[in-house]
Amino acid sequence: ALNHQLPDRLPLDFIWPRRETLQALQLHFQADSAEGVFRELGIDFRWIPILACYPKFQMRVNGRLEGDAPGAGNEYVFHDPRTFEDQWGIVFRVGADGKYLEWKDGPLRREHALEDWSVPEVVYPPIEQISRRLESYQNYVTVTEIEFPFKLAWHLCGLEDFLMSMVSNPGMVEALYDKLYAFQTEKSVLGARAGYDVIAVVGDVAGQTSMMFSPDLFERFDVPRLTSLVAQVKRANPETKVLYHSDGNMEAIIPSLIRCGIDILNPIQSACMDPAAIKARYGDLLTFHGTISVQDTIPNGTVEDVRDEVTTRIKTVGYNGGFIISPENSIPYDAPLENVLTLFKTAREFDYSSF
């Protein structure tokens, strides 16, 4: 599928499952781990982080995030029981429902702060150690992810301030992006050299109806640097693919992403774009990943709705290969378990010989 050849069956992924969803599935399957759930569902991908150490940050850590919010189980610098700081100095607050995080502050909100700021000191494991860990997943597609610099930048600066700077202070944006892209390129190349199958570049640049900023700004700030990142990954390991993730309607930059060398596009959010039309337009140039609605069908639809969407998506996006089916993003924690099971059962049982 990744090489645009018709596979013997449809590849499956289960992107960013929430803790509550995994717990419900473990109970359903009587599985003792998330890995057991993935095997029961027939998932072909394994998202495996590169376990980096941030020495200066680690000296300040004073607690572990508990509960069900993203990042639960990780260590942070807590300002109060619900507010914490990560290794980049970005401050988040656990929402009132305990399920989601809210951005609160970043270290570059002050004027001229960039002059005194540098990326965090990081120590990665030896490449041999990373490669040995991947050996346990030889029968799966292995993925590690990096944060897209736009996402990191607005978390550091504040969204409104950073969007304004893209127009009013492009020199600052260039300087910040040089630092962020260099940091993420180093990690990406390490992952490729260690043997990861896919490097996922993750960060939203669009809302429901349009881009968060002009495609011309993406062309100016991101295209040269993203092209370099992808090229360095390919030099390190020609077999490694690069996936780009952005929710929302980001169709305006798809041609730019293709020119950058992106191999896989996720999630083709069906509430914002037409997956069949995107396949028809770009299917010879990109592999598509995702497309199953976590805004509507999975949380709110019937089992039949889920079955119909999965079948339609396979028929309209899965022809000629180049398609990996997955939820578009994390499935909401209160989505019916039957719908989650139906998604993967329908995909597994689809008769691919009909193509």
Briefly describe each language-model feature range.
Residues 1-33, 85, 94, 98, ...:
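Active-site loop segments of alpha/beta catalytic cores
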